[in-house]
Regions:
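Catalytic alpha/beta core domains of metabolic enzymes, predominantly
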Residues: 175, 181-305
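A mid-to-C-terminal "edge-of-domain" accessory segment
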Residues: 4-5, 11, 246, 253-420, ...
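Alpha/beta enzyme core
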Residues: 5-7, 17-42, 55-64, 78-199, ...
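Short, ordered loop/turn segments at secondary-structure junctions
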Residues: 47-48, 73-76, 100-102, 141-143, ...
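Non-catalytic terminal/interface segments that mediate subunit docking, oligomerization
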Residues: 17, 22, 30-31, 365-473, ...
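Short beta-alpha connecting loops at secondary-structure transitions
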Residues: 67, 170-171, 226-234, 249-258, ...
């Protein structure tokens, strides 16, 4: 009989720490609902004390989802725990995730403290959190570099204090898989009453070993894994949810199973990628567009004879289905609504669906077929409806051997502004014209263009990074016209620093 492994998703907390990947509350709810459909056991919804936005997001996510446990992160600080408990008040199943650094590096340089004081603070935090909730998870930050004997003392003490889950993070991504596995095994063998709590993994990917370390932890007794969709996260990212889910599905001999509905992996991956403006690496395991592509002649020949020659997974097991409905200009609202639902996006408001359908028809008139990525892009355009600064019109004249000229119209909170400029190419001319209206000192730091699919009629995605007053702001634009997409991305940056200011 298989043992149960609990999946703790931290896409909305740790995953959102990627620069430029911040979501608003509506988008976070959308992801949380998709994670519920995916079958995750715990959703870490945010760090409530860090900002009013995170606090509100935890409240709204608690209201929006039904069966997963909603978790809020805190430091080992009473105020943090108070705020987290308040944010979780609407959650049907709630957990407070509190903790403190336990490595000598953290104790000495971060806390200017000693081991005994850190141990006392850890126990006090768990006891304080237990006043609010039964389910308390403790994290020993930088456990990967904490010596096993002291770590075991901390784990034993917090379990005695009432911790129901103990998280052993490889915070810096330093551990080798064998080393991390031995650490979990040591705890399982040396901590009294270890059976009273679930040991959890939380691995970072700085050396590319997050998934391997997580798997090693599971093989040695951990029964919760902390993961993110597409492996997104701070620095080099976290353990990828889809990788752990499919490893266990492919290796049933391990005798460990999750509650993940793997057929929703692809849709979840694309939703997160679209909302966070974070392109998926083409050769990314499980969810990259090349994950099930075969270009080598020898491989193609084998697959044509029998797919098992080179494919260890059925693409349909992760939700990749080549027989899906093709959307064109003749597709109706029902077909679009069905496709949105398949991608995890449900619209109860007919007005919002009508608005997306109008955008869909405009795009379908320009393209032969509208793909799933296009649909996600159209749905994501909702976030810009509330922006104070919007593009009204754009006209560009360009050619070989001549300076490009751009005329642009901008709507700023209902007021219309127009300007024109020349430039070294159409994008440069359009951005210069826009700068004449905005009159802010901004420096373009990063500019990337990506085609969503293939074809001359494809939608281009532009990711942009702009520096203003010492701060970096990230913008995104998508359009069949790459100049318009570039201007949209620049305006997105401006709206973000206007909101931040």
């Amino acid at each position: 009989m298989s043992e149960r492994l609990f999946v703790f998703d931290t896409t909305l907390r740790d995953g959102e720490q990627v620069p430029g990947c911040q979501l608003n509350t509506v988008e976070k709810i959308q992801v949380a609902r998709q994670l519920e459909q995916l079958g995750v056991d715990v959703i870490e919804a945010g760090f409530p004390v860090s900002s009013p936005g995170d606090f509100n997001s935890v409240i709204e996510i608690s209201k929006a989802v039904t069966w997963p446990t909603i978790c809020a992160l805190t430091r080992a600080v009473e105020k943090d725990i108070d705020v987290a408990a308040d944010a979780l008040s609407y959650a049907r199943h709630k957990r407070i995730h509190t903790g403190i650094g336990t490595s000598d590096e953290h104790i000495q340089y971060k806390f200017n403290s000693n081991r005994e004081e850190i141990l006392e603070r850890a126990v006090a935090a768990v006891k304080y959190a237990k006043r609010y909730v039964e389910d308390v998870e403790f994290y020993a930050e930088d456990a990967g570099r904490t010596d096993n004997e002291y770590l075991a003392r901390v784990v034993e003490a917090v379990i005695k204090a009432g911790a129901t889950v103990v998280n052993i993070p490889d915070t810096t991504g330093y551990c080798l898989p064998e080393e991390y596995g031995r650490k979990i095994k040591y705890l399982m063998e040396h901590v009294d009453h270890i059976d009273r709590a679930i040991i959890s993994t939380h691995c970072h990917n700085d050396l590319g070993m997050a998934t391997a370390n997580t798997l090693s932890g599971v093989q040695n007794g951990a029964r919760q894994v902390e993961v993110t969709v597409n492996g997104i996260g701070e620095r080099a990212g976290n353990t990828a949810l889809e990788e752990i889910a499919m490893i266990l599905k492919c290796h049933r001999q391990m005798g460990i199973e999750t509650n993940i509905n793997t057929r929703r992996i692809s849709a979840t991956s694309r939703m997160v990628s679209s909302l966070m403006n974070m392109p998926i690496q083409a050769n990314k395991a499980i969810v990259g567009r090349n994950a099930f592509a075969h270009s080598s002649g020898i491989h193609q020949d084998g697959v044509l004879k029998n797919v098992s020659t080179y494919e260890i997974m059925d693409p349909k097991d992760v939700g990749v289905d080549d027989t899906s409905i093709v959307l064109t200009a003749r597709s109706g609202r029902a077909a679009l609504k069905h496709r949105l639902s398949m991608l995890g996006i449900d619209y109860d408001d007919p007005g919002k669906l009508d608005k997306i359908y109008e955008r869909f028809l405009c795009l379908a008139d320009k393209k032969k077929e509208v793909t799933d990525d296009d649909v996600l892009m159209l749905a994501g355009a909702d976030r810009k409806d509330s922006h104070a600064i919007k593009l009204d019109f754009l006209q560009v004249t360009t050619g070989m051997g001549v300076r490009s000229v751009a005329s642009i119209g901008i709507d700023i909170s209902g007021q219309k502004f127009e300007e024109a400029s020349t430039g070294n190419g159409p994008v440069d001319a359009a951005i210069k014209a826009l700068k004449k209206i905005i009159l802010k000192q901004m420096t373009l730091r990063e500019f990337t263009i990506q085609a969503i699919n293939k074809g001359s009629d494809d939608v281009g995605k532009v990711h942009m990074q702009v520096e203003h007053d010492g701060h970096l702001y990230y913008g995104f634009g998508a359009n069949t016209d790459i100049v318009t997409a570039s201007v949209d991305a620049y305006i997105d940056c401006i709206n973000k620093f206007k909101t931040a200011g």
